[in-house]
Amino acid sequence: KPVYIICFTHYHADHISGLPGMLLTMGNAERTEPLLLIGPKGLTRVVNSLRVIAPELPFPIEYMELAEPEHSIDFEGFRIEAFRVNHNVVCYGYSIIIERSGRFQLDKAQALNIPKQYWSRLQKGETIETPENVFTPDMVMGPPRKGIKLTYCTDTRPTEGIVKNAAEADLFICEGMYGEPEKKDKARE
């Protein structure tokens, strides 16, 4: 699937300066769908400054600026949770939680005499109406399963917020640059 959301942790050049090239590449690929950019307050101003070299795009850009220490943003099928981390500028980490539906219960489908041609549609959440019956996903699907969680943070000192937000993550990505004790002062800058 094409990229339709980009989350920015903060606006230091090494984290955002590649955006114009990415936008131009998307435009050259004939993208027309909107692109949502999420990041700390000031995102619109920063991106508009970078767009001097990519002013005309065949798709709209939407902005979501974060101001609170924590945000939860629901989308169809997944959720993004943003949380502040400890950097020398306002900086966010992100958790992406992908929802997972329950398992298809073959025995229930067979017991209800649901024709096989409807099974995959029911698994995808579709309700099937026939002249004789109405079949709904809840008739054949088990309870929702635990979602898949990815947590990402960068350019931060250790914080309780990271521990809290990375809890139960299936994948935790955290960049670290200054691990040696003699570079402790550099890490605090």
PLM region descriptions:
Residues 3-12, 39-40, 150-156, 173-175:
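Active-site neighborhood of phospho(di)ester-bond hydrolases with catalytic His/Asp-centered motifs
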Residues 19-22, 47-50, 162:
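Hydrophobic packing residues within well-ordered alpha-helices of enzyme cores
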Residues 1-38, 62-70:
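Active-site metal-binding motif and surrounding structural segment of the metallo-beta-lactamase
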Residues 70-75, 128:
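Short acidic-hydrophobic surface loop/beta-edge motif
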Residues 42-51, 63-68:
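A gly/proline- and charged-residue-enriched helix-loop-helix capping module
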Residues 78-152, 156-165, 171-173:
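Active-site-proximal loop/helix segment associated with metal-binding centers of metalloenzymes
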Residues 23-26, 51-54, 98:
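Active-site catalytic pocket residues across diverse enzymes, especially alpha/beta-hydrolases
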Residues 68-70, 158-189:
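Binuclear metal-ion centers of metallo-dependent hydrolases, dominated by the metallo-beta-lactamase
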